[in-house]
Amino acid sequence: MADGHLTPAPLVIVASNGTGGDMQPFIALAQALQQRGRRVRLLVPGWQEAAALASGLAYRTFGTQEEGQAMLGDPGLWDERKGWGVVWRGLVPHLGAVRDVVQGLPGGEECVVLCHPFLVPMAALGRSVRPDLRIVAAYLAPSNLCSSHDFLAAGSLRIPAWVPLSWRQALWRLLHRSMVDPVLLPGLNGARAQHGLPPEAHFFAHMLAAPDASLGLFPAWFAAPQADWPPHFVQAGFPCAAPHGAAALPPELERFLGEGEPPVVFTPGTGHQHAQRYFSIALEVLRRLGRRGLFLTPHAPQVPQHLPPNVMWQAHVPFAALLPRVAAVVHHGGIGTSADAFRAGVPQLIVPFAYDQFDNGWRIKRLGVGDVLLARRLSAGRMQRQLARLLAAPEVALACGEVARRMGPGLAPAHLLDQVEAALAAA
């Protein structure tokens, strides 16, 4: 440089929203980037401030604890038709959060936003004060890429492989115009107008097109690159197990595991507060199968009050330590839980409620390591039959072993960071 000083590396604003499965990967990426010498600032919802504080990173929050609890307390959050609207209504008052951070930076300081795809509209509003703001969307799962070529499910509607491409494209258009845009566009375009930006015609089209580059945090054997994915797409793979994954199991859980056969794990996801029926059915299924069980949820009131000795409840357990010691895991289809089960080589029964869970579930079934039981069709009889088959089928055990070998120890942190840096450089 002419003045003999090096230009500082751009500040990376890492922004995410959602429950633990959405937050932890972004926090881990932010920590790793900082360890590599990048300047990093987290941007998270106020109800996730404890996670940001524990990360040791500089951070900003948007929204309040009360707003987050109101969202989690809304049963519509786990309805495939209503869920996106519940999340979006909580975000709309805070769509200017990235803009506020960018506006507060010293004049001329470079920055780039690395964000959850659902926060791309928030990041794009930052261009009202910095038109050249660079954005990288990091996709934890493939469903939000809205590919017509690899379109497995529209919510609970399974899309067979024989459906022609033109029909798949038409179905995406119908879904977006009839169910997505009427709910999400008014808030988005209201915020854009407030900040002097033109309106967008379609929500997901904006989400896919606004980033300068995109990053896929899943491997090609789970979702191969497609012709209609965004340009400048860098595909990495599943991140390694969480840093706390090697933590010891609680002593009472160690005793439980040592007292009998490997249990079946049941979890509807950390954010689910409306799973009373799910756990009641799980308890009945365990009784019918004569199996031991482990119920995982931080929300104890939804677990049956009096559990038999062969069933245990825990609020939080490190999956990397637990899952290699269980018979199977019944879960919602969250991508983090799915990857942990792949790594452990255990069968999975997916009970999807909303969001990417359906698509993840059918990909798991396609790999031969699990099955799908739609939440709206959940019954003790169906769960018993599907779980019994998964536990007994030798071909499922073989497929689980093969996928575990593909996973290996996980994507090396250095290699993952190289891919993240490549996406940041492409922006």
Predicted segments — roles?
Residues 36-41, 133, 289-293:
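A generic structural motif
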Residues 43-45, 62, 116, 136-141, ...:
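Generic beta-sheet signal
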Residues 49-50, 66-70, 141-148, 357-359:
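Short gly/pro/ser/thr-enriched loop/turn and capping motifs at secondary-structure boundaries
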Residues 93-168, 216, 220-223:
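Conserved nucleotide-sugar donor-interacting segment of glycosyltransferase catalytic cores
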